[in-house]
């Protein structure tokens, strides 16, 4: 019995120690730091020892309950199913901060409120937070040459400034100091102006004409504002013209020199037809649509061979483009066949005030066979500004010839006719009266001495000779006073070049008021 009493006493002591350990663990969790828990354990060790000694001092054998007699040997331990081990029969434990009850151990978080996260108030914690922040690294890009040369801090702006521009050079640097040093070294070597720094928000990269830089126009985003309707399967068509349609004399001279010096090595989508004084562009599939538009405005195109999606002519005037689409869908059975646009055009004329005459075009649409491009040769370009009028007169004569040849064709379908443009195609049937009247009206409007925007006696003389061969008559009241000058000029020309235009420098008169002309063709 004495051994049993000792064992029971040791059991109670161990239970007290266990309760103390649990209470201290709970207190350590409440403080939120294991270090503080260790310090609390160290500080409360005398309390624990005092509680143990007091329990031993007050213990007497009479307080021990006798264990009921067991029915079998080895069953002297307490029955685990007895209510004495339930939490309600266990004693409360006093700690430094609060009275911990055994029932608390069965509650969520052991009856201890979850401590709130405190703000970092130490330099160590602040340093730990700042060390986790990653500052983005900014690269700098130097565009050395081209229309948008400068120093950029954004790759998107740099790409827009260099994309599609031939011969442009650019490089990336890690710091603005390195970028500035490289830019200054380049400008000093090239003896050009100092490159400016262009931040992201101040970059203004607007598309320029092909004559200045080959930059494609930006794609236009579609904005759908209607609610409750189905979005169309395709985006809206781009604007008809994405740049200024009026061509300047400098742009014309640039395109003229480009056609004369083109040798066919740099671009497989272009070949040229070279004559004595002028070279005309021929555009194949995948040609640059903006260059097609500018060459069209300059009157320097002979033929266009567009793709099935007609992307090469998407910047031409809308009515011309629509006429080509109607021909493709309504006039040929196999819409997948390749087509061509054969263009006969005048060239622009300028005065001191600016553009005087825009080109006029006669366009033939047809089904294209196998393309056999002519060999492009680099021709010598010696044109001067004073020679542009003579070149315009020559193009005007060829334009009139092409327009009058329509009278010999009996099977023509007029696809579109405008003030300065006629689009036609061949037809399997004879020309109907409506189309014939449209052709005659267009001829009467444009075939005159004022074809180029001013009265040109050389054009009148050419028209008169051409109409007389057809058995008709042509009269111009502007030429009545200058018949002798025209005859003398034509006589001088016969000794040199019978087919070329007469000299025009001394006989060109600017038209102030539109003139009336008559044309009779038998």
Curated annotation (Swiss-Prot):
A Gene Ontology cellular-component term: host cell cytoplasm
| Subcellular localization | Host cytoplasm
Taken from the record, one Pfam family name reads Cauli_VI
Source organism, top-level taxon = Viruses
Q: Does the keyword Transmembrane helix apply?
A: no
Bias (Basic and acidic residues) occurs at 487-500
Annotated region (Disordered) at 487-522
Q: Does the keyword rRNA-binding feature in the UniProt annotation?
A: no
Q: Which UniProt keywords apply?
A: Host cytoplasm, Translation regulation
What the entry lists under InterPro entries is as follows: Ribosomal_bL9/RNase_H1_N, RNase_H1_N, RNase_H1_N_sf
Cite a single GO BP annotation: regulation of translation
Q: What is its main location?
A: host cell
The function of this protein is: Enhances the ribosomal termination-reinitiation event leading to the translation of major open reading frames on the polycistronic viral RNAs.
Q: Which family does it belong to?
A: Belongs to the caulimoviridae viroplasmin family.
The remark listed among the other comments is: The inclusion bodies are the site of viral DNA synthesis, virion assembly and accumulation in the infected cell.
UniProt-recorded name of the protein: Transactivator/viroplasmin protein
């Amino acid at each position: 019995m004495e051994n049993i009493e000792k064992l029971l006493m040791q059991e109670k002591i161990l239970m007290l120690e266990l309760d103390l350990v649990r209470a201290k663990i709970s207190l350590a969790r409440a403080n939120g730091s294991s270090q503080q828990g260790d310090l609390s354990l160290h500080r409360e060790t005398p309390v624990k020892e005092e509680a143990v000694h007091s329990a031993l001092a007050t213990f007497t054998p009479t307080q021990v309950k006798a264990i009921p007699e067991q029915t079998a040997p080895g069953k002297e331990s307490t029955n685990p199913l007895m209510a004495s081990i339930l939490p309600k029969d266990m004693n409360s434990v006093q700690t430094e901060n609060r009275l911990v009850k055994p029932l608390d151990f069965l509650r969520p978080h052991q009856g201890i409120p979850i401590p709130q996260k405190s703000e970092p108030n130490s330099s160590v914690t602040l340093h730990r937070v700042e060390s986790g922040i990653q500052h983005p690294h900014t690269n700098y890009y130097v565009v050395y040459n081209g229309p948008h040369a400068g120093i950029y801090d954004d790759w998107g702006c740099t790409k827009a400034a260099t994309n599609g521009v031939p011969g442009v050079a650019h490089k990336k640097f890690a710091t603005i100091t390195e970028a500035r040093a490289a830019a200054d070294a380049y400008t000093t070597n090239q003896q050009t102006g100092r490159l400016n720094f262009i931040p992201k928000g101040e970059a203004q990269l607007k598309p320029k004409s092909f004559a200045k830089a080959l930059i494609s126009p930006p794609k236009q985003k579609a904005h759908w504002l209607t609610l409750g309707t189905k979005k169309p399967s395709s985006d809206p068509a781009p604007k008809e013209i994405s740049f200024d349609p009026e061509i300047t004399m400098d742009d014309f001279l640039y395109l003229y020199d480009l056609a004369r010096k083109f040798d066919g090595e740099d671009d497989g989508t272009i070949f040229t037809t070279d004559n004595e004084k002028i070279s005309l562009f021929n555009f194949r599939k995948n040609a640059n649509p903006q260059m097609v538009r500018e060459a069209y405005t300059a009157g320097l195109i002979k033929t266009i061979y567009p793709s099935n999606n007609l992307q090469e002519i998407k910047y031409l005037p809308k009515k011309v483009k629509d006429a080509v689409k109607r021909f493709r869908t309504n006039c040929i059975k196999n819409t997948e066949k390749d087509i061509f646009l054969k263009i006969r055009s005048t060239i622009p004329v300028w005065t001191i005030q600016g553009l005087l005459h825009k080109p006029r075009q006669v366009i033939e649409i047809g089904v294209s066979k196998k393309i056999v491009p002519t060999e492009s040769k680099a021709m010598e370009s010696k044109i001067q500004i004073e020679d542009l009028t003579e070149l315009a007169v020559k193009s005007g004569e060829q334009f009139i010839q092409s327009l009058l040849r329509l009278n010999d064709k009996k099977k023509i379908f007029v696809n579109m006719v405008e003030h300065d443009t006629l689009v036609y195609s061949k037809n399997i049937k004879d020309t109907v009266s409506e189309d014939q009247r449209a052709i005659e009206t267009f001829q009467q409007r444009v075939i005159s001495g004022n074809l180029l925007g001013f009265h040109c006696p050389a054009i009148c003389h050419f028209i008169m000779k051409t109409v007389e061969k057809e058995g008709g008559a042509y009269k111009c009241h502007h030429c009545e006073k200058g018949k002798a000058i025209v005859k003398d000029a034509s006589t001088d020309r016969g000794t040199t070049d019978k087919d070329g235009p007469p000299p025009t420098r001394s006989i060109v008169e600017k038209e102030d008021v539109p003139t009336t002309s008559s044309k009779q063709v038998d």
